[in-house]
Every structure is written in structure tokens, then in C-alpha cells.
């Protein structure tokens, strides 16, 4: 009995229609990246585990897909090690490679390995899949695409400004209304300092980053469980829940963080970004959000997140500044900043809001009906001219019944059908049928092309 076919949990197949929609997303993002001078690279699907481990925190390391070595990988493992049942230790013995978790760490590795060939500042983009051994659920997959853009080799805040312009341009092209949220890790560090818990900055940021998901009471509970004092938690409340305009929030922060040099630096950086963007005429809202803390360990400056306003869904884009990601690979002092568009969530938003342009998801424009060998040969001549003019066209491969061929056109939403029988061949023309209106007209090859390209 044949095995029932299936795919791993957290992965998906994509139909031709879905792929047309996904390519619309990728192509839109790619076009905007090119507009801002970014160049494309690709890195391998698998990296050495030594490259990946320790870059995403303890939780991130648990979500790495590890690849088993080829050959007799148990030969070098002692009975004692096997009996210990220490999964992490055993995996290190017979797994040297892993599937990439994101595109940022492989990019840092790429920069270090190719430093002599790269012109800095290096503006790169990358659109590739990543894998995470997460528990699959609605909107969360084990295999998904990221669409990253990063600038490395420059600490200018103009890079942050440009990335926010890219975000605004992309979502304006999609027709999705968004709120661009920004914060700064230096502000969060300053807050940790002034509440007397400077050494707990990671615990604080991980907890408050969950505010939207679990609510304030649960955030406070998690902070207490991490050993943060009740007094510090009380001091934290009015700061992270600060309201008002961006300018009002910045003014308050200057007072609140007056004793923190690091915190004031973060306020200064945020003020520059927000003030510069104000002169750029962004189409979308931008908000300074002090609860934005993005849990990844490597952010050191500005951090960003984008939320769709008309759909209940998580973050659809995120990013931030990292000052020494390449340092772990032996190349210290290279500052960078980047963003990552969540293509899968953008796909869901565009579906829910029905924002895909018709031309983006349309396939074949013209189908030639096949009545037999002579008619097909005649049709192929017109078909070649149509394709040369950029018309997406095909001929039904078999001389099947007319009903079957017309049904094929209907199911595939092909808007025009060309019918070539003996009478049409005698006149050197084709009968062009509009499948929506039912209108038919006898046309030359040139007239057919004109009708479909106007």
C-alpha cells in the first residue's frame, strides 16, 4: 500500500494563483529596494551551527533546525554520553550544520568573509526562506520568507530615515494603511538604569515587548518572576504607558532620563529620525512607542515595527540598529541597520483587504482553440506574434471538444479566446471572443494584438 502523501507541519504548498500573489509582493518590495540603491545577495539555506548558535538568545537557539551529519555519526559518541540523554550535547556531536533562522546573522557572516570585495557602506537586500522549529499555529510557520534590507559600514541616522521611507513607500504601493512604530534600545537601557535595574535590561525588554499580546498585568507578573523589585515595576508603569504626541513624549523623556547619558542619547537619536521624517511627507502614521522592545539580543539603537491598521494581525515588518553583529566573527566595529518585511503576513493582509491588483494575479490573457493539425499550425503563427508583443498566450494542446477547451479558459480566468477554423484560415484571420461580454469579432493578427495591448 502506497504511503499517504503529506508535508511537514508548519510548511505549505502554494498554488499558481497564490504564487502570482506572492511574486507580486516580492517584486514590489524588490522594486522599492532597487529604487533606494540596494543590491541583492543570497546565502546558503544551511549554515555552520557555530555561525548560528548563541546569536538569538537561549530561546532562539532552541528553535534552530539542526542537520544530521552524513555517515556513522554515532561512532564517536560514548555509551556514557548516550545514556546521559543530554539532547543539546548529543546534537553537537553529530550535527555541524543548521538551517538559517533569519537572514541577518548569515549576512553578518557574509560581510566578514567578503570584506575585501565589498564597498562600504554596503546596501544589500535579500529575499529568501528561513526556518524555525517553532510550534506551528495560525500565522506562524516553520518555513517562511523574509525580505531584508540592511546598510552596514555607516552609523549615520540617515540610514534609519531611508529605511522608514522604504517602509512607507512599500505599504503605500500595496494600499495597506499602517502605523510605523519606533523606539530605541538606548532609551530602554536608560529606563532600566533610572528604575535601578540596569543589569536586568534583557528581562525588562523581553517582558514589555509582550505588552500587546499578554496585557500589562501579565507583563508585571513576568517582571516580578524575573526578580525585578516591586518599586522598580511601579516606576516603570508611567514611562512605558506614556501618551501624547511624539514631541510630547520626547520632551517628557528628556526630563525622566536626565540622569542617564545612554537614555538621553537614545532620545536624541529618536528626535533626529522623527523630525527628519516629518519633512519627508510620509503617507503613513509614525509613532514613538516605548513598549516596543523587540526581543532579539543584537539591537543596540533604533528599533522599528509596523502594524496594519485595518486588520488584526501581528507585526508585518520589523528591524533596528545593531552596532557589532560582525564582532562575533572577528570583525569589530561595523555598525549596521536593517528592516525585514514579513511576506507571509503581508500576503494574509492583502488577501483579507482584497488589495491585489487584477493584473498582478492574472495569468494567460489569450487561449487559442485547437480544432486540429492544420488549424493549430495556422494559430501558432499568430500565437508567436502575440507572444512577441508581450501577450501571455497559449494554445490548447489537444484537439478536444470545444466545450472542454472553453471550460479550460473559464476555470483559468482567461479573458480572451481565439477561434481559428477553416473559414478564418481562408481569410487569414481569427475570431476573437471576449469571455466576459461574449462579444466576438473577426480580426487580423495585428488587430488582435492591438485589442489585447491597448
From Swiss-Prot:
<keyword id="KW-0963">Cytoplasm</keyword>
<comment type="subunit">
    <text>Homodimer.</text>
</comment>
<dbReference type="InterPro" id="IPR004516">
    <property type="entry name" value="HisRS/HisZ"/>
</dbReference>
<keyword id="KW-0648">Protein biosynthesis</keyword>
<keyword id="KW-0030">Aminoacyl-tRNA synthetase</keyword>
<dbReference type="GO" id="GO:0004821">
    <property type="term" value="F:histidine-tRNA ligase activity"/>
</dbReference>
<dbReference type="GO" id="GO:0006427">
    <property type="term" value="P:histidyl-tRNA aminoacylation"/>
</dbReference>
<dbReference type="InterPro" id="IPR041715">
    <property type="entry name" value="HisRS-like_core"/>
</dbReference>
<dbReference type="GO" id="GO:0005737">
    <property type="term" value="C:cytoplasm"/>
</dbReference>
<dbReference type="InterPro" id="IPR015807">
    <property type="entry name" value="His-tRNA-ligase"/>
</dbReference>
<dbReference type="InterPro" id="IPR033656">
    <property type="entry name" value="HisRS_anticodon"/>
</dbReference>
<dbReference type="InterPro" id="IPR036621">
    <property type="entry name" value="Anticodon-bd_dom_sf"/>
</dbReference>
<keyword id="KW-0067">ATP-binding</keyword>
<comment type="similarity">
    <text>Belongs to the class-II aminoacyl-tRNA synthetase family.</text>
</comment>
<dbReference type="InterPro" id="IPR045864">
    <property type="entry name" value="aa-tRNA-synth_II/BPL/LPL"/>
</dbReference>
<keyword id="KW-0436">Ligase</keyword>
<protein>
    <recommendedName>
        <fullName>Histidine--tRNA ligase</fullName>
        <ecNumber>6.1.1.21</ecNumber>
    </recommendedName>
</protein>
<keyword id="KW-0547">Nucleotide-binding</keyword>
<dbReference type="Pfam" id="PF03129">
    <property type="entry name" value="HGTP_anticodon"/>
</dbReference>
<dbReference type="GO" id="GO:0005524">
    <property type="term" value="F:ATP binding"/>
</dbReference>
<dbReference type="InterPro" id="IPR004154">
    <property type="entry name" value="Anticodon-bd"/>
</dbReference>
<dbReference type="Pfam" id="PF13393">
    <property type="entry name" value="tRNA-synt_His"/>
</dbReference>
<dbReference type="InterPro" id="IPR006195">
    <property type="entry name" value="aa-tRNA-synth_II"/>
</dbReference>
